[in-house]
Regions:
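Eukaryotic low-complexity, proline/serine- and acidic-rich intrinsically disordered regions
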Residues: 1-7, 53, 60-65, 76
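Short alpha-helical segments that sit at the start of domains
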Residues: 1-22
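Acidic, Ser/Thr-rich intrinsically disordered and amphipathic helical segments
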Residues: 2-9, 29-33, 42, 46-50
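Generic structural hydrophobic/aromatic packing signal, biased to beta-strands
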Residues: 10, 14, 29-31, 54, ...
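Beta-strand elements of modular eukaryotic interaction domains
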Residues: 17-25, 50-51, 65-68
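Short acidic, hydrophobic short linear motifs in intrinsically disordered regions
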Residues: 21-37
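Charge-enriched amphipathic alpha-helical scaffolds
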Residues: 35-67
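Short, cationic-aromatic polyanion-contact patches
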Residues: 66-84
């Protein structure tokens, strides 16, 4: 799977699992929700790598450079735009 395709899938999963903020048209999901979701586990070989690639392209934002299960479960992943 290529990076762009995985980012598109990530966008879909953030919308499926997250909450929309109608004020600024963003979606937010907790890292722990994404990480522990069975569908996401089956889609993404390296969720953190996909998140970092999306962050580099300014599609998502989150605090920190790398996210770890358990330690960062409550970190918000914010979808800034839903297109590449």
């Amino acid at each position: 799977m290529n990076v762009e395709h995985e980012i598109k899938l990530l966008i879909d999963e953030i919308k499926r699992l997250g909450v929309e903020n109608s004020e600024n048209k963003t979606w937010t999901v907790k890292y722990g929700v994404l990480f522990s979701d069975d569908k996401c586990a089956n889609i993404f070989e390296a969720l953190v790598g996909t998140l970092r690639a999306a962050k580099k392209r300014k599609i998502v934002k989150f605090d920190g450079e790398i996210l770890l299960q358990g330690v960062h479960d409550q970190v918000d992943i914010v979808l800034l735009k839903d297109t590449l």
